[in-house]
Each structure stands twice: as C-alpha cells, then as structure tokens.
Amino acid sequence: MTLEHDRKGISIAVSAEVQAALDAGQPVVALESTVISHGLPYPHNLELALAMEQEVRDQGAVPATVGIVAGVPTVGMDAAAIRRFAHPDPHHPPLKVSRRDIGYVVAAGGDGATTVAATMALAHLAGVQVFATGGIGGVHRGARETWDVSADLTELERTPVLVVCAGAKAILDLPATLEYLETGGVPVLGWRTAEFPAFYSVSSGLPVAYAQDASFVARAWKAHRALGGAGMVLAVPPPVEDAIDRAVVEAAIERALNRAVKEGVHGPAVTPFLLAALARETEGESVRANVALLRQNARIAAQVATAIAGI
C-alpha cells in the first residue's frame, strides 16, 4: 500500500512503511534507482538493490528506493517495481531521469530511473533527509570546452538532502568539482578522513573537513540547515580491501577517455561509456569496488539518519 500525496494535481507515491517512519520521526534513507536499471546486469543489479535495502534495515532505518513507476514519482518502491526496473521489458526500459526529465516522464506515464539529482528532488518532497549513493556527478574533464557539468551539483546547492557517497565519480575533474561545491555553499565532510576519496580509491590528495562519527555529522547537518544551508556531502572512502590504487585508476581513465574521443562519444553517453571501459581495463575490479562501496554507503547513511533522528 502506498500513500498518494497530491502536489498541484501531480501524485507522489510514498510507501506506507516510509510514511509511517517519517510520521514517527524514525530514520529513513533514500536510495536511487539508476543503479538498478543502468548499473549492473541482471540479476546482479537486483541482488545489489536488495542488499542495499537490507544494509539500511540492519542499522535500524527504513530504506526508500526512489523512482518514477508508470508515471508516478515514488519514494519507497516495492519489490515488484524494483524487479521490473532490474529486468525490464527490453522494448520499454526505464529512462535515466535527472531533475529536468521528471516532468516529461510523468507526463508520458513511463518508468524513470532517478539519478542523484532526481532522487534528491523527490526524496525532499517526501521529507527524507538522507540519501545513499555510489558517487555524485560533477565537473567533467575538459569541461572548459564542453561545459559538461552534472546537475547533481546544482541540486546540492538548492535541495536540503545529505548525500552519503564515495566522493564524485573517478572519471570526473575532482578538484574542479570541489571548487564548484565550495562556490555553491555545499559542505563536504570526509567520513573519518581529511581527504576527498576518489571513488574507487581511498584518497585523492584533496582536503575536506574531517567528520569522526555519525553523531558529529548529524550535528553539522542540523546546524547547516538551521542556518539556511541546502545540500551536504558526506564523502566515505571505499573499503580498503576493495579499493584500487589511484595510479591504476588514472591510467585506465586516460585510455578510456582517448577511446571516447576517437569514437565520438559525448553528452549523457560519456559516463556509462567510461565506466564500462574502466570495468574492462581493470578486469572487473572497478565493478567489485563499486558494489562494496555502495553497500557500505547505505550502511553509513543509515547510521547518520539514525543520529539525525535522535537529535
């Protein structure tokens, strides 16, 4: 059963479990659906989606997987919807949806897998404060020529959701991404680290503010919001046992970027192309690291959401 919230004639479905938790002031963690439909192949994508939800539950919080299901923005997708996104009709797969695409997919009555930006937007409408993902988008390498900057960054500037991630995706220009976030007034905290993680790698050499535990993150979030701030990033290094050496990742990225240029890949197709190329270059190590950090981020996000609920 879901509860329908009408917003100027547009319905937003919030699962009964999620709504009950929100009403009771209990911790809720949003999860994106792009990782289901545009991440791993079936059945690994389904296994990961369910594992992330279980990581959240194991910490005493309620998971809320976000997506657009048959034209209805949904916060707290049920098992049937998650399975449909994981193994869709090949003729009608879910569209990859950022904030700009939400209205289009709703009007078309289709399925939409939400990116970081769209997940933040819908989670906030439902009242969810914490969101776990793999990595945020950011400023792409070569953005001086292409102007390719992810909508995730502008969403963080305006939408009050705390995003728990492994930093920005490694294929991006990490220094420029941090500069953009600073300009937008978006705090970036490192989970038990003073260095910005580089997604697959533990560190990038770029400094961030140190956060020692969930209680501190919760207090920082409350203060940030009370003083008019919007989004916040909690950057969590990947598990050490699954991390990949930064030099190895950079070499693989350079080769992948050269291939992208030669093959004329551009726009929204760049990120999936590069991630697939990285998986080949690292013989699957990047995929294993991605799965490990996603599960870890879900777990830590639940701890943070619990700490926020306890203040």
Curated annotation (Swiss-Prot):
Keywords: Glycosidase, Hydrolase, Lyase, Manganese, Metal-binding. GO terms for biological process: nucleobase catabolic process. Catalyzes the reversible cleavage of pseudouridine 5'-phosphate (PsiMP) to ribose 5-phosphate and uracil. Functions biologically in the cleavage direction, as part of a pseudouridine degradation pathway. It comes from Roseiflexus sp. (strain RS-1). GO terms for cellular component: cytoplasm. Substrate binds at residues 96, 116, 150-152. The active site is at residues 32, 169. PANTHER family: CARBOHYDRATE KINASE PFKB DOMAIN-CONTAINING PROTEIN (PTHR42909:SF1), ZGC:136858 (PTHR42909). Binds 1 Mn(2+) ion per subunit. GO terms for molecular function: hydrolase activity, acting on glycosyl bonds; metal ion binding; pseudouridylate synthase activity. Its cofactor is Mn(2+). Pfam families: Indigoidine_A (PF04227). This is Pseudouridine-5'-phosphate glycosidase. The gene is psuG. Mn(2+) binds at residue 148. Gene3D superfamilies: Indigoidine synthase domain. It catalyses: D-ribose 5-phosphate + uracil = psi-UMP + H2O. Its EC number is 4.2.1.70. Homotrimer. Belongs to the pseudouridine-5'-phosphate glycosidase family.
